[in-house]
């Protein structure tokens, strides 16, 4: 029997029930009632400092500490939510409700990330325009989330496709485009390096303070408009480049490195990705590499996410070295980056990427005595390079760098000159060198690198060892010579001495030094010789920012007849997408590496070609036909929650300082930012890194006052579920699977349509045919039961199994709470106003103290367990005292708000408990002795419970069974042995 069928059987029997029993029908009525009250009264409105959103439920921001909690907003690309999606939303809501009850001004809202590939692909599948399907999906998601009872300030909701939002996304792009990174300037946080308006760079060129690259000796005014644009393009933080990109024919667009899997496939769709040289927009995120690493120390994020970002950015210290390359067109410069400049004496050849510019200067004929196996069977270097470039384009990036793959390469006919030794190094091209990593050129040291060694062996190139093992290591270089490279950063430098260097004519010796000492010495020599310097490099590549899609933000850029880009003035924003029927991208055979992108907007000539006056009279311009990636809107959306009605500012300064500024509350710290951001760890090197980059640019330019967007990050786990396959391996509907008797090994059996079915455990998803929706839960149990079950399943940060059979346990808790307050027969309140006995006082105050700790630590599951203990105790009393049940209701309300609002109202309170004071423990009764009860199944400890020393054995048994319900699979145990208060031993049913 499937979980869905069992859930139906597990429903409380509503026939012949008392008239006022808490059941699914009553819950639905209560929930809809309170959701309407909350909406009508603006219960969850947060109060701004100024503007239209200043009033918040009769409160204002003055004197109230702010707290900003938010979720990673959803992509409205499917047909709605399943029960796994809201885990983070519910957690954020619980925290938000708790902080409101602490007297804080809480901002909690929800928007929709509506642009990008997911929404467009869904629209293509359904045959409708992306805007229509996206807005329908938003409406459905909004309904599902509203029905969940989430405490959003709905005045602050928006979608990234809203024209008013697109305007500010394009405005931010304009500021980034109109900025450059000055490494010598001091940023507002006091560290080195700062984004500055591009006008300040122009001033330096005009005044002569800075030489004009490529035009040394010329005045800025002597350059043409196109020449000036080209120079500035090399400095802008958003710039146009013709460079190797990840081209995905199956999707018809280019992808950022972060959107390509380790297998060289597109993250979405799993299509092959190829390296192509195309003209694209990029963002100079690498300029912020060091700050993006350094500032991780200022924020409260999971260490695993910090590590993922550090590794992705990949800061390394080494040297840039310039080699002269002799070409038919004169001596050219080849810059390489190496982390081991101490091995320059061991360089025996050099390698450039197939996309490297030096390959435009190869000779017409092979040099004399070129070995045949270096030529690859080609008559000339020109033919060889052309063919090799085509072959490289047809490979994925993963294929090119695969350590286990065959090392391919060709001699270019060129030689590079070692700046120290003067040795002529044959220059090869090989596809394992990528143009977008480092400089696209490497010096090869086969004595110290495995890949270089393999390449040298294949092409008969010399191997020079420049490092030997330390004497105390017990190792010897003889173990490697002629067999393998000696790859170590810890050793003694050898074979690295010369009487007269090529670049300076002086002597240089590194022999006898440790590697680190040799690196320092050679770096100093490189700088003194003018052929290099110590530098920092990053694994991180600049962010590829353009897509050949329809459903994205248009760029606020037009091009003149000469191709010069022009930024549109802010008053012309937003630039909206034209409403056209032909919005789908042109896709290709996934293996067609030779295909060329075709942006859908290029087909709309009336939109592309425009007459504009940009200050020098009306002229014809052409719009950029690329669109921004789906990450653009999500880079800054957190700030728009502060006031989406503001038409004058991206974010107004006073509002930013109040909600997100440095030290805006006791926990914000100097980094400032959102107080709590909940979302999946899968966004660690995508959205989270991009948002930090945009935020830092805006910080440098003075538009925001905090150096980080998100102060505290919390990654929720995943809700998992069973899925079922037939004997062909095809997934079958989980709701139609029937559980049969156990097999000979005691394992359950399953059938679908009378045929054997196999059960597996993993994700919940449409393709797995095991989706359970929140709507199912609302109908069968109510939103509060759903919230209570999901929050009580286990620690928020861990993945956990969904089991519909166990949802009824959460409903029974709410039913017991209801019965403690309401007479099920008459509907009358049944609490008393008597004083609490000592036992109840102790339990109540310890529960308040403990639950407060659990809520602060975001452990709602353990808070629920403690509230169950208190409620069970109240159930055992002859009469339930108001003084005990009201604090219980208040503490449960962040998790199950509707039933708590109803009970609070029935107890005579006229105001919503959403803003009631959180209970405070009376310290006189806190800290009383408790014991740890161990729950064992077949002798193995499966749970631990903190209980009162005088707990009733029956109550302990009930708590123990609830704690291990998932492990029992919904079956009654064969035997339970209770030794209160310390041990519960369970023998499960066979």
Swiss-Prot record:
Keywords: Aminoacyl-tRNA synthetase, ATP-binding, Cytoplasm, Ligase, Nucleotide-binding, Protein biosynthesis. It catalyses: tRNA(Leu) + L-leucine + ATP = L-leucyl-tRNA(Leu) + AMP + diphosphate. GO terms for biological process: leucyl-tRNA aminoacylation. GO terms for cellular component: cytosol. Residues 573-602 are annotated as: Disordered. One of its GO terms (molecular function) is aminoacyl-tRNA deacylase activity. It is an enzyme of class 6 (ligase). Coiled coil: none annotated. ATP binds at residue 766. It is found in: Cytoplasm. It holds the Pfam family tRNA-synt_1g. Gene3D superfamilies: HUPs, Isoleucyl-tRNA Synthetase, Domain 1, Valyl/Leucyl/Isoleucyl-tRNA synthetase, editing domain. Its EC number is 6.1.1.4. The keyword Iron does not apply. A motif ('HIGH' region) lies at residues 74-85. InterPro entries: aa-tRNA-synth_I_CS, Leu-tRNA-ligase, Leu_tRNA-synth_edit, M/V/L/I-tRNA-synth_anticd-bd, Methionyl/Leucyl_tRNA_Synth, Rossmann-like_a/b/a_fold, tRNAsynth_Ia_anticodon-bd, Val/Leu/Ile-tRNA-synth_edit. Its main location: cytoplasm. Belongs to the class-I aminoacyl-tRNA synthetase family. NCBIfam families: leuS_bact. This is Leucine--tRNA ligase. It comes from Bifidobacterium adolescentis (strain ATCC 15703 / DSM 20083 / NCTC 11814 / E194a).
């Amino acid at each position: 029997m499937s979980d869905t069928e069992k859930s139906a059987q597990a429903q409380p029997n509503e026939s012949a029930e008392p008239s006022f029993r808490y059941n699914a029908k009553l819950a639905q009525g209560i929930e809809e009632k309170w959701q309407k009250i909350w909406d009508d009264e603006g219960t969850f409105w947060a109060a701004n400092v100024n503007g239209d959103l200043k009033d918040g439920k009769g409160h204002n921001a003055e004197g109230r500490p702010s707290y900003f909690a938010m979720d990673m907003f959803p992509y409205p690309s499917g047909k709605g939510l399943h029960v796994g999606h809201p885990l983070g939303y519910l957690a954020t809501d619980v925290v938000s409700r708790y902080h409101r009850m602490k007297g804080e001004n809480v901002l909690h809202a929800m928007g929709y990330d509506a642009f990008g590939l997911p929404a467009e692909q869904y629209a293509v599948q359904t045959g409708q325009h992306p805007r229509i399907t996206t807005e329908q999906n938003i409406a459905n998601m909004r309904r599902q989330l509203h029905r969940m009872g989430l405490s959003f300030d709905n005045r602050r909701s928006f979608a990234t496709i809203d024209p008013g939002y697109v305007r500010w996304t394009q405005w931010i792009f304009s500021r980034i485009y109109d900025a450059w990174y000055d490494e010598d300037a001091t940023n507002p946080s006091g560290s080195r390096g700062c984004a500055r308006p591009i006008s300040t760079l122009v001033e330096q060129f005009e005044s002569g303070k800075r030489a004009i690259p490529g035009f040394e000796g010329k005045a800025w005014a002597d350059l043409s408009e196109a020449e000036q644009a080209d120079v500035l393009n090399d400095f802008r933080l958003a710039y146009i480049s013709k460079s190797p990109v990840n081209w995905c024919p199956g999707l018809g667009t280019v992808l950022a490195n972060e959107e390509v899997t380790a297998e060289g496939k597109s993250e979405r769709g799993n299509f092959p990705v190829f390296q192509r040289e195309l003209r694209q927009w990029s963002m100079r995120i690498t300029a912020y590499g060091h700050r993006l690493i350094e500032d991780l120390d200022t924020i409260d994020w999971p260490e695993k996410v910090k590590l993922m970002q550090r590794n992705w950015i990949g800061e390394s210290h080494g040297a840039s070295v310039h080699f002269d390359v002799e070409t038919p067109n004169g001596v050219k410069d080849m810059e390489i980056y190496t982390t081991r400049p101490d091995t320059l004496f061991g360089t025996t050849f050099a390698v450039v990427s197939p996309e490297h510019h030096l390959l435009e200067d190869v000779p017409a004929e092979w040099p004399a005595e070129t070995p045949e196996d270096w030529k690859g069977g080609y008559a000339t270097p020109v033919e060889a390079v052309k063919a090799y470039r085509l072959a490289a384009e047809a490979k994925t990036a993963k294929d090119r760098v695969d350590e286990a793959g065959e090392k391919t390469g060709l001699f270019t006919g060129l030689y590079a000159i070692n700046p120290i030794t003067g040795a002529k190094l044959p220059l090869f091209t090989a596809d394992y060198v990528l143009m977008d990593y480092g400089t696209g050129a490497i010096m090869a040291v086969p004595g110290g690198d495995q890949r270089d060694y393999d390449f040298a062996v294949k092409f008969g190139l010399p191997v020079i060892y420049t490092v030997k093992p330390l004497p105390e290591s017990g190792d010897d270089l003889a173990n490697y010579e002629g067999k393998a490279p000696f790859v170590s950063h810890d050793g003694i430098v050898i074979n690295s001495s010369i009487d007269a260097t090529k670049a300076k004519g002086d002597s240089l010796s590194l022999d006898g030094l440790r590697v680190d000492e040799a690196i320092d010495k050679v770096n100093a020599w490189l700088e003194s010789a003018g052929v290099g310097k110590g530098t920092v490099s990053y694994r991180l590549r600049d962010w590829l920012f353009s897509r050949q899609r329809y459903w994205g933000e248009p760029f606020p850029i037009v091009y003149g007849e000469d191709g010069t880009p022009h930024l549109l003035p802010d008053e012309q924003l937003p630039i909206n997408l034209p409403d056209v029927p032909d919005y789908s991208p042109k896709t290709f055979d996934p293996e067609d590496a030779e295909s060329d992108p075709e942006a859908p907007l290029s087909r709309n000539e009336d939109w592309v070609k425009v007459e504009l006056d940009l200050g020098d009279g009306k002229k014809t311009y052409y719009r950029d036909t690329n669109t921004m990636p789906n990450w653009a809107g999500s880079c800054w959306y957190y700030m728009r929650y502060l006031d989406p009605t503001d038409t004058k500012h991206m974010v107004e300064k006073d509002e930013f300082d109040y909600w997100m500024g440095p030290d805006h509350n006791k926990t914000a710290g100097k980094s400032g930012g959102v107080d709590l951001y909940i979302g999946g760890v899968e966004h660690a090197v995508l959205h989270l890194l991009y948002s930090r980059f945009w935020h830092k640019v805006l910080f440098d330019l003075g538009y925001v006052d905090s150096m980080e967007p998100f102060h505290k990050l919390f990654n929720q786990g995943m809700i998992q579920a069973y899925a079922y396959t037939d004997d062909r391996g095809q997934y079958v509907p989980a709701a139609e699977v029937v559980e049969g008797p156990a097999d000979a090994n005691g394992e359950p059996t399953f059938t679908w349509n009378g045929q054997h079915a196999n059960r597996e455990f993993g994700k919940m998803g449409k393709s797995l045919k095991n989706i359970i929706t929140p709507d199912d839960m609302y109908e069968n149990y109510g939103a509060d039961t759903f919230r209570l079950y999901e929050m009580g399943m286990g620690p928020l940060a861990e993945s956990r199994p969904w089991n519909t059979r166990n949802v009824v346990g959460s409903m029974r808790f709410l039913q017991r709470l209801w019965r403690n307050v309401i007479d099920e027969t008459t509907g009358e309140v049944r609490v008393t106003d008597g004083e609490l006995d000592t036992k109840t006082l102790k339990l109540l105050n310890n529960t308040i103290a403990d639950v407060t700790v659990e809520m602060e630590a975001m452990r709602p599951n353990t808070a629920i367990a403690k509230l169950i203990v208190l409620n069970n105790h109240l159930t055992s009393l002859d009469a339930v005292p108001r003084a005990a049940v009201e604090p219980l209701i208040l503490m449960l309300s962040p998790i199950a708000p509707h039933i708590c609002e109803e009970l609070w109202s029935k107890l005579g309170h006229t105001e919503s408990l959403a803003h009631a004071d959180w209970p405070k423990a009376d310290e006189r009764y806190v800290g009383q002795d408790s014991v740890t009860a161990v729950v064992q199944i077949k002798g193995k400890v499966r749970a631990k419970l903190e209980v009162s020393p005088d707990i009733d054995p029956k109550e302990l048994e009930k708590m123990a069974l609830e704690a291990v319900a998932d492990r029992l699979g919904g079956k009654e145990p064969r035997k339970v042995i209770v030794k209160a208060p310390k041990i519960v031993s369970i023998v499960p049913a066979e």
